[in-house]
Amino acid sequence: MSLIHMNIIMAFTLSLVGLLMYRSHLMSALLCMEGMMLSLFILATLTALNLHFTLANMMPIILLVFAACEAAIGLALLVKISNTYGTDYVQNLNLLQC
């Protein structure tokens, strides 16, 4: 395993640990998930470049699209919770039930 791959896997692991530690605030959780998605994107891009497989070149782009959708939905939920309750605690998520 090269040093670059090890650094990317370590960045993913640190983002996962950050998500587990700072899960009480929605903004912190969103930032950690974004770090996880970006490290997965870089790892998928490096893998596609190393494989020289034409169909594998679409995988990082698809992953980036899903990351953008996740970020947009998460930020919309953050704005809704912040405007309604004045805080971004994750405990307020079950208050949004119909």
Curated annotation (Swiss-Prot):
Sorted keywords for this record are:
Electron transport, Membrane, Mitochondrion, Mitochondrion inner membrane, NAD, Respiratory chain, Translocase, Transmembrane, Transmembrane helix, Transport, Ubiquinone
What gene codes for this chain?
MT-ND4L
Translocase found in the keyword field:
yes
Q: Which organism is it from?
A: Hyperoodon ampullatus (Northern bottlenose whale)
GO CC annotation = mitochondrial inner membrane; respiratory chain complex I
Location(s), subcellular: Mitochondrion inner membrane
Q: Which Gene3D superfamilies match?
A: 1.10.287.3510
Q: What is its main location?
A: mitochondrion
Q: What is the official name of this protein in its record?
A: NADH-ubiquinone oxidoreductase chain 4L
Which proteins does it associate with, and in what oligomeric form?
Answer: Core subunit of respiratory chain NADH dehydrogenase (Complex I) which is composed of 45 different subunits.
Functional note: Core subunit of the mitochondrial membrane respiratory chain NADH dehydrogenase (Complex I) which catalyzes electron transfer from NADH through the respiratory chain, using ubiquinone as an electron acceptor. Part of the enzyme membrane arm which is embedded in the lipid bilayer and involved in proton translocation.
| UniProt xrefs under InterPro entries | NADH_UbQ_OxRdtase_chain4L/K (IPR001133), NUOK/Mnh_C1-like (IPR039428)
Q: What is its EC number?
A: 7.1.1.2
